């Protein structure tokens, strides 16, 4: 398990863009983390005030950060950054609303040099909310 301090050591993101609250499981190529979604998230001010829904792109960013924690926690990547290089097969299946706990899983399926490909999914109460294939570039 990695707490918020460990997450902040791995990721350069800070409020309001730090979207990983805790890491529950870590293995060589897979990580499981959570994001507790509250009404205080800044994006709810405009998306949508009368019916707050977490934007899909923010869910994908949370998944990317989850993968980033795993990759940037490795000694050889300390101090580096992870940049989006692409997203494929992204699907949104369930709305994420205040009070939900997003359980995010990212599994690295391919690495070549500084490029990595991740299969990622986000679930709420065991139900798929979003999924996709994310491609990253690791840089200084």
Swiss-Prot record:
Question: GO CC terms on record?
Answer: cytoplasm; membrane
Which positions carry the signal peptide feature in this UniProt record?
none
Return the Pfam families for the record.
Answer: FabA (PF07977)
Give compartment(s): Cytoplasm
Q: Could you tell me the Gene Ontology terms of the biological process aspect for this record?
A: fatty acid biosynthetic process; lipid A biosynthetic process
Q: Which InterPro entries match?
A: FabA_FabZ (IPR013114), FabZ (IPR010084), HotDog_dom_sf (IPR029069)
Q: Which reaction does it catalyse?
A: a (3R)-hydroxyacyl-[ACP] = a (2E)-enoyl-[ACP] + H2O
Name the Gene3D superfamilies on file.
Hotdog Thioesterase
UniProt keywords (A-Z) are: Cytoplasm, Lipid A biosynthesis, Lipid biosynthesis, Lipid metabolism, Lyase
Main location as per UniProt: cytoplasm
Q: Active site located where? A: 47
The main enzyme category here is lyase
Matches recorded under PANTHER family: 3-HYDROXYACYL-[ACYL-CARRIER-PROTEIN] DEHYDRATASE
Full protein name? 3-hydroxyacyl-[acyl-carrier-protein] dehydratase FabZ
Q: Which organism is it from?
A: Streptococcus pneumoniae serotype 4 (strain ATCC BAA-334 / TIGR4)
